[in-house]
């Protein structure tokens, strides 16, 4: 992963404040970071893939005139509460959290996108989730796990995922692939492929907000 990180380090990652570009604002949230590595397998660490995929998404969106704010642009620890507080404070048009999945038996595979429960019958986040998923599948032969909502076991009226549940803004969470699945990661095994994944996520966002 170090080669992927070094090849992507040249990306412009300075967070931009809202309003500078004159376009819509997107908040990109690379999952985990710092002392929270996320999933890992064979030396691959989720937090690194999340960040580098997010850098590519940011680069693409900025090239298209979007104003992009990253919750983190380095390998630092950031709580879920801080991520959503930043979103609720800066009020982007869309919050997108980027992750790589994992499974206990290493049998999980494919790509999926979670969106807000309130949009289950149609709405912004369902549209965004659909567009991101379609764009990823356009370039990667991953299993289509679909777009999904997930509810709290204790309250079926609330989103399970904190960054969706506690976020006042439209928000989705992308699980790009299973980090512990050899077939999945064989499709994303170079800096170019990581960049392509991030670009496809960016295209899905662009499709939704243009």
Regions found by a protein language model. Name each.
Residues 37-52:
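Glycine- and acidic-residue-enriched helix-capping/strand-helix junction motifs
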Residues 36-38, 182-183:
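A short acidic, helix-capping loop that chelates divalent metal ions and anchors anionic groups
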């Amino acid at each position: 992963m170090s080669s992927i990180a070094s090849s992507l380090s040249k990306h412009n990652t300075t967070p931009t404040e809202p309003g500078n570009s004159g376009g819509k604002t997107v908040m990109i949230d690379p999952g985990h970071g710092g002392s929270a590595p996320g999933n890992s397998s064979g030396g691959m660490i989720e937090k690194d893939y999340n960040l580098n995929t997010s850098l590519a998404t940011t680069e693409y969106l900025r090239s298209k005139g979007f104003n992009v704010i990253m919750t983190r642009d380095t390998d630092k620890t950031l709580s879920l509460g801080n991520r959503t507080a930043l979103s609720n404070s800066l009020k982007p048009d869309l919050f997108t959290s980027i992750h790589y999945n994992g499974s206990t038996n290493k049998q999980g595979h494919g790509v999926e996108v979670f969106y807000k429960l309130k949009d289950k019958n149609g709405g912004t986040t369902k549209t965004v989730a659909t567009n991101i998923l379609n764009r990823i599948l356009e370039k990667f032969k991953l299993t289509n796990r679909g777009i999904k909502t997930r509810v709290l076991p204790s309250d079926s009226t609330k989103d399970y995922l904190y960054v969706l549940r506690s976020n006042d803004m439209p928000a989705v969470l992308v699980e790009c692939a299973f980090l512990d699945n050899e077939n999945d990661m064989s499709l994303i095994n170079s800096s170019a492929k990581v960049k392509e994944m991030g670009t496809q996520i960016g295209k899905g966002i662009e499709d939704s907000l243009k």
